[in-house]
């Protein structure tokens, strides 16, 4: 019969297309899908493709007013996960037109906005994204990148050294600045505000900025090296964040810092643009990442959050330490460290890289090894991360 038929249809009739040849402009996603008992994997994979693109739970007459073939996400391949019962990797291709240019926020809202609460799925994890050059070229990316940072700092052929000022909460601004001076004078390249140092009653941000700047200039004068302190510009509103970055620029310091997940991608991208326009380096902390990436079978893998940060913009990002953890984790960590630093990364499933990623000429991000590391870890850290990294102690 011709005409419109309402009713609930299986997603796989429309959204599971194993014969589909992916386009060079498609955004590709690899999801780890755990279907509910009785739900076939093809239906679960198609449901993800539908709900994160053009589909809804039923057919509506307005579907006829657009071209689904042009705009729908497609689940084009499904494979079982070795060694896991009832787990599959579903590959989904999204047409480029579904996404706003230069917006990580919109990309995530589309791809992971709704599907994770889906009834047909017991659990869902976004393992990897392939960002085509046609899309990544709409982003500024890191404010400066690895090479420009080395030129600004005049430090080459070695990892950069930093430490976080402790106790992280409770010091007055003056004593905080004193600790910054001692660390920088003693030979570190950078000191760091802790991620939860914003502007608390015992130390308001402007006081901290002034005393830290004094410490930087004093240490620079005495050592003849360029020094920096990651001044945390993260704030309760985007306007306040930019205000703090403006103050840092006026004080003439080299680098500011942002918590990109708690602060949000929109704020982070604004800050990255400001930093490039004004010659500030941008250090990114990943506070809250484990809420999103820790579960093996649900959430978003950190390599996706790392790719998103490279697009949104940051010159440093915390990326784990590898030291003392499992060997397998080492390969996976090195996988996303390469995704942060290199121009072109080959698909390599043993390192968790599901797609070949071509960043073309987008600047790289320095990985920051941070969290529970001390001097005895140095040989392992330099072997794992090589020269292009920041070793952040404390």
From Swiss-Prot:
Q: Where does substrate bind?
A: 114, 164, 168, 286, 318, 370
Active site residues per record: 166 (proton acceptor), 285 (proton acceptor)
Would the keyword Chloroplast be found if you checked this record's keyword annotation?
Answer: yes
What InterPro entries does the entry give?
RuBisCO, RuBisCo_large_chain_AS, RuBisCO_lsu_C, RuBisCO_lsu_C_sf, RuBisCO_lsu_fd_N, RuBisCO_lsu_N_sf
Say which domain of life the source belongs to: Eukaryota
GO-annotated molecular function: magnesium ion binding; monooxygenase activity; ribulose-bisphosphate carboxylase activity
Question: What is its quaternary makeup?
Answer: Heterohexadecamer of 8 large chains and 8 small chains.
Instruction: Relay the record's extra comment.
Output: The basic functional RuBisCO is composed of a large chain homodimer in a 'head-to-tail' conformation. In form I RuBisCO this homodimer is arranged in a barrel-like tetramer with the small subunits forming a tetrameric 'cap' on each end of the 'barrel'.
Q: What does this protein do?
A: RuBisCO catalyzes two reactions: the carboxylation of D-ribulose 1,5-bisphosphate, the primary event in carbon dioxide fixation, as well as the oxidative fragmentation of the pentose substrate in the photorespiration process. Both reactions occur simultaneously and in competition at the same active site.
State the protein's name: Ribulose bisphosphate carboxylase large chain
The lineage is:
Eukaryota, Viridiplantae, Streptophyta, Embryophyta, Tracheophyta
Gene from which the chain derives: rbcL
